[in-house]
Amino acid sequence: MKLLLSGMLAGYILASSILSMTTGTPRMPAISRETLHLVGYSSKMKIPNVVCINSRYLSSEGGWVKRSVNYMFPIDKPWRGKSSTVEVKWEPYAVLLHMKTSYDVSRDLQTKSQYVVRNYDDNSLVLSDLNEVSSCSLWVTKEYLDKIPETTNRTFYHLCPDPVYTPFDENCYVN
């Protein structure tokens, strides 16, 4: 009987160690080295004449991550692009994502200084306005532009009123 119990215990320990190796804590995309693409938002957040919004990792220092925010104005051909630096900070498991932006980014993209993290995994992120829960944005890595993770997609669709998905435009990747 002791041999059977010790065999079961050994099997449990082995299974637990394998599970813990494969199901760790997800990486927060906003502070990772991945490029993030805005693929959805609440319809009331639509910004006329701004498309192709993405954010690339630049560096980190003192708990803040520097990212470039890139976006296009599709008014004339060729499209005019703009790039600015923002800083983001997120404490592990925290509800809030903090952001420092330039005046231009704040004006062009109507950014806030804090966002509520509604859902995230290694490749996707749903944020909402701290004061206006109905204002949400959905960000994914390039690998997930065509296949948004189900839990993230469900969170975006159910928590964000009148969700809008941004259409893929090849002009975003010409430059």
Swiss-Prot record:
InterPro entries: Calycin. The keyword Cell membrane does not apply. Its main location: secreted. Glycans are attached at N153. One of its GO terms (cellular component) is extracellular region. Expressed in salivary glands. The keyword Glycoprotein applies. Disulfide bonds join C52-C172, C136-C160. Keywords: Disulfide bond, Glycoprotein, Secreted, Signal. It is found in: Secreted. Residues 1-24 form the signal peptide. Belongs to the calycin superfamily. Lipocalin family. Homodimer; non-disulfide-linked. Each monomer accommodates one molecule of cholesterol in a pocket. Each monomer contains a pocket that accomodates cholesterol. Cholesterol derivatives (such as epicholesterol, epicholestanol, epicoprostenol, or 7-dehydrocholesterol) could also fit in the pocket with minor rearrangement of the side chain. Since arthropods are unable to synthesize cholesterol de novo, it is likely that a cholesterol ligand would be bloodmeal-derived. Salivary tick protein that modulates host immune response. This protein blocks dendritic cell (DC) differentiation from monocytes. In addition, it inhibits up-regulation of costimulatory molecules and pro-inflammatory cytokines in response to stimuli and promotes up-regulation of co-inhibitory molecules and the anti-inflammatory cytokine interleukin-10. It has a pocket to accomodate cholesterol, which may have immune-modulatory roles, either directly or through interactions with the host gut microbiota. This is Japanin-like-RA2. The lineage of its organism: Eukaryota, Metazoa, Ecdysozoa, Arthropoda, Chelicerata.
